[in-house]
Amino acid sequence: MSVMFKLPLNLRQELKKPLGELIKGEIPIPYLKLKEIVNSNTLITVGDVVTENSLKVGLRPRLAIYDHKTERREYKPEIGDKGVLLTVKNPPGTITLHLLKTIKKAYSLIRRGTNVHIVVNGEEDLAAIPAVLYAPLGSFVVYGQPREGIVLIKVTSECKRRCAEIMRNMEVVRNGD
């Protein structure tokens, strides 16, 4: 049985607001600022452009989640050393149970010293939410804010509670109903 969490219309506006600190600027400025704040041991990136540009400034995310698209257009990021590569299907506007399990598995691999890349077949736009839920406290999750910059989330108990609340307010869909 497939289970997914679907973003309802009433949450879409809320999620357009950054979940963390917005670092504004043209590329590479936000990534150079990011490098001053975080180190690779605590970095999780969500999105092709974010992952690619983090790597370009010398950061090596422990977990990178991307879908070979940017703003719903095909995109082939320049991403070199991957570590373990996992793939998962995740339709737009959803968080599938499979994505949740894959992110959880990625963190168990990271605890063993491996960097992990998850390539999403579909869309990873909501993946920052489960990335925060499963991330160790003190980690940093970064995702893109189109035409503005990047959003930096420091993973705290409060931040995890907020993401859990978002998940609770999503519509649960079983077997595509």
UniProtKB/Swiss-Prot annotation:
**Positions annotated to bind GTP:** D48, V49, V50, D67, K69, E124
Q: Which Pfam families does the protein's record reference?
A: DUF359
User: What are the entry keywords?
Assistant: Coenzyme A biosynthesis, GTP-binding, Kinase, Nucleotide-binding, Transferase
Top-rank taxon: Archaea
Read off the NCBIfam families from this record: deph_CoA_kin_Thcocales, PRK01160.1-1
PANTHER family xref list: GTP-DEPENDENT DEPHOSPHO-COA KINASE, UPF0218 PROTEIN TK1697
Q: Which HAMAP family match?
A: Dephospho_CoA_kinase_GTP_dep
- In UniProt terms, what function does this protein have? Catalyzes the GTP-dependent phosphorylation of the 3'-hydroxyl group of dephosphocoenzyme A to form coenzyme A (CoA).
Q: What is this protein called?
A: GTP-dependent dephospho-CoA kinase
- Supply the source organism for this entry: Pyrococcus furiosus (strain ATCC 43587 / DSM 3638 / JCM 8422 / Vc1)
